[in-house]
């Protein structure tokens, strides 16, 4: 038995593929599962209002292909952040999260990843941090009711770019259903910034890590770095 399972993020595949084709492509490439995306586009958010029949079609495709959708990335909460000063954005963020947990429950998804931002497009303040914590506690309660793990992703900005910072919120929320979904690329860049050790930082989250996002980075560059051209030590992290 393998020590871990390896998943493929849906957005790594062409958007023109239907669900059965995406699952078949992931299986053919040797992956163990697929991660579904709920990003800030209205097209992806609309998935949260799929009919029971549409949900069943996805389940059917998973069984026919033999490839599960096991995790979900709710990056829509970057725009509709849980600490946002705009009440309507905060409210929509919580609605998106609640519906995401419902969809995850229907599809048999175990882990729902949410970005570790109090705000993204706006300035981070004491108030946005307090609001984020308040809503994160509510989110943890929703996850508890659904029996699904929430995973805080470590991001690229100062608010939550290390496991140590994410552990603060795991501790304050005090829920068995709120854990950490570290991004090893972001952690590596943070380690360069702070002159710290990536593995030591990950050790601070032992027992509280649901998954590991395998992403390549370079100092100061967080996206679109091809594997093998950056500075992330994947072997050591895994």
Model-found features: residue ranges?
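Short active-site-adjacent helix-start/loop capping segments
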Residues: 42-45, 70-71, 78-82
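Short glycine-enriched, charge-decorated loop/helix-capping segments at active-site entrances
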Residues: 45-50, 85-89, 127, 224-229
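Active-site acidic/histidine proton-transfer and metal-coordination neighborhood
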Residues: 20-21, 27, 61-65, 78-182, ...
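Glycine-rich, proline-tolerant flexible connector loops at the mouths of alpha/beta enzymes
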Residues: 35-63, 116-123, 222
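Histidine-acidic metal/acid-base catalytic patches
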Residues: 1-7, 15-32, 91, 145, ...
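N-terminal-biased segments
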Residues: 9-20, 48-58, 95-97, 195
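Hydrophobic faces of well-ordered beta-strands that scaffold small-molecule active sites
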Residues: 4-10, 34-36, 69-74, 112-114, ...
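Short histidine/acidic/glycine/proline-rich micro-motifs that form metal-
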Residues: 10-14, 40-47, 118-119, 155-158, ...
């Amino acid at each position: 038995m393998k020590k871990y399972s390896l998943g493929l993020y849906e957005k790594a595949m062409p958007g023109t593929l239907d669900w059965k084709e995406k699952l078949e492509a992931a299986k053919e490439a040797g992956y163990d599962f697929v991660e579904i995306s709920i990003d800030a586009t209205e097209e992806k958010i609309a998935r949260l209002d799929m009919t029971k029949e549409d949900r069943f079609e996805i389940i059917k495709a998973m069984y026919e292909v033999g490839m599960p959708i096991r995790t979900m990335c709710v990056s829509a909460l970057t725009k509709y952040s849980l600490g946002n000063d705009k009440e309507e954005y905060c409210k929509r963020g919580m609605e998106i999260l609640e519906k995401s947990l419902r969809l995850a429950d229907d599809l048999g998804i175990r882990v729902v990843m949410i970005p570790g931002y109090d705000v993204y497009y706006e300035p981070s303040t004491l108030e946005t941090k307090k609001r984020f914590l308040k809503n994160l506690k509510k989110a943890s309660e929703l996850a508890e009711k659904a029996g699904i793990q929430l995973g805080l992703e470590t991001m690229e900005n100062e608010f939550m770019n290390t496991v140590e910072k994410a552990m603060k919120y795991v501790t304050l929320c005090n829920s068995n259903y709120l854990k950490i979904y570290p991004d090893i690329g972001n952690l590596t860049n943070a380690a360069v910034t702070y002159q710290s050790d990536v593995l030591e930082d990950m050790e601070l989250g032992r027992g509280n890590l649901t998954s590991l996002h395998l992403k390549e980075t370079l100092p100061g560059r967080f996206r679109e770095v091809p594997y093998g051209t950056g500075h992330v030590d994947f072997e050591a992290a895994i």
